[in-house]
């Protein structure tokens, strides 16, 4: 099936998402969708400042897929493109927006890493349209990006914004937010995950355990992740964002949701850690610790 992809950026106002065929991919995640005749879909992400939202349209013989990712660091970008390369597609068309504002160091590093990864795919890349380092992420819908497929032979890679509620961004009631913030505190650090896979009980327990103990400054109780529930929105942006002046309006509320989730998980963490140690095989993290201690 031959699908034409148009790269189209706009200043359109936000609209409600369709009730069917709409898929949101949050920060630190990717998800792959097959584009099938008669099945329209939209895959979408938002809130990007220094992050880069990337859509990779891959051709596999008669099949076409799109993989959407919200990438937030050079290591995350590199890990994602390892996954893309492993798909062993016949060709790739790559579209992206983000890495703003352009004078931010993280934005510059992310943009450079994305370009390197695209170049490393070599001749298989037939199209690369990358809108990076363009300006204020709050303007011209620069923080939004996705791909809309009409169910026929046309897809639009663009930045039409959608009006979403917190439960649509984080259906796990805060677990995704805890993952996003705490995943690099895991050993080894986790760069990216497949959003099509639900979190397991053990994953949420381990992430919540980290979140309950985490402080940005070990000597300052006020810097604890769980203390976010006591902070005003401006304090959250200043303390927990690398681009505090540019964050989306829902940034602070989403972090509060994650902190509340971790607090609510505290008794589950205590019970589960005891239960898991006694009745189930250790996680890879625990197994690694045992092996390295010998």
Residue spans for each PLM region:
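Conserved mixed alpha/beta catalytic, RNA-binding, or beta-rich assembly cores of soluble enzyme
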Residues: 36-88
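Gly/Ser/Thr-rich loops at beta-strand to alpha-helix junctions
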Residues: 47-51, 100-107
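Short beta-strand segments
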Residues: 55-57, 97-98, 148-150
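Acidic, glycine-rich active-site loops and adjacent beta-strand->loop/helix elements
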Residues: 71-74, 98-102
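Short glycine-rich phosphate-binding loop at a beta-alpha junction
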Residues: 90-99
């Amino acid at each position: 099936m031959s699908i034409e992809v148009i790269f189209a950026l706009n200043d359109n106002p936000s609209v409600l998402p369709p009730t069917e065929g709409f898929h949101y991919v949050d920060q630190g995640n990717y998800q792959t969708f097959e584009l099938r005749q008669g099945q329209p879909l939209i895959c979408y992400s938002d809130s990007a400042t220094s992050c880069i939202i990337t859509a990779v349209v891959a051709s596999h013989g008669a099949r076409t897929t799109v993989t959407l990712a919200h990438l937030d660091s050079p290591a995350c970008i590199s890990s994602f493109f390892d996954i893309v390369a492993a798909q062993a597609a016949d060709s790739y068309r790559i579209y992206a927006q983000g890495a703003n504002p352009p004078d931010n160091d993280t934005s510059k590093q992310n943009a450079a890493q994305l370009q390197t990864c695209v170049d490393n795919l070599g001749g298989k890349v037939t199209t690369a349209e990358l809108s990076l380092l363009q300006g204020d992420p709050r303007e011209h819908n620069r923080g939004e990006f996705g791909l809309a497929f009409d169910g026929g032979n046309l897809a639009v890679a663009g930045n039409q914004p959608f009006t979403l509620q917190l439960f649509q961004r984080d259906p796990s009631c805060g677990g995704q937010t805890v993952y996003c913030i705490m995943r690099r505190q895991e050993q080894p650090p986790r760069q990216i995950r497949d959003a099509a896979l639900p979190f397991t009980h053990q994953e949420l327990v381990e992430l919540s355990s980290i979140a309950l103990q985490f402080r940005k400054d070990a000597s300052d109780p006020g810097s604890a992740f769980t203390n976010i529930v006591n902070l005003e929105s401006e304090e959250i942006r200043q303390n927990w964002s690398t681009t505090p002046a540019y964050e989306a309006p829902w940034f602070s509320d989403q972090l509060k949701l994650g902190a509340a989730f971790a607090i609510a998980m505290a008794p589950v963490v205590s019970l589960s850690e005891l239960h898991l140690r006694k009745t189930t095989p250790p996680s890879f993290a625990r197994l690694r610790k045992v092996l390295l201690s010998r």
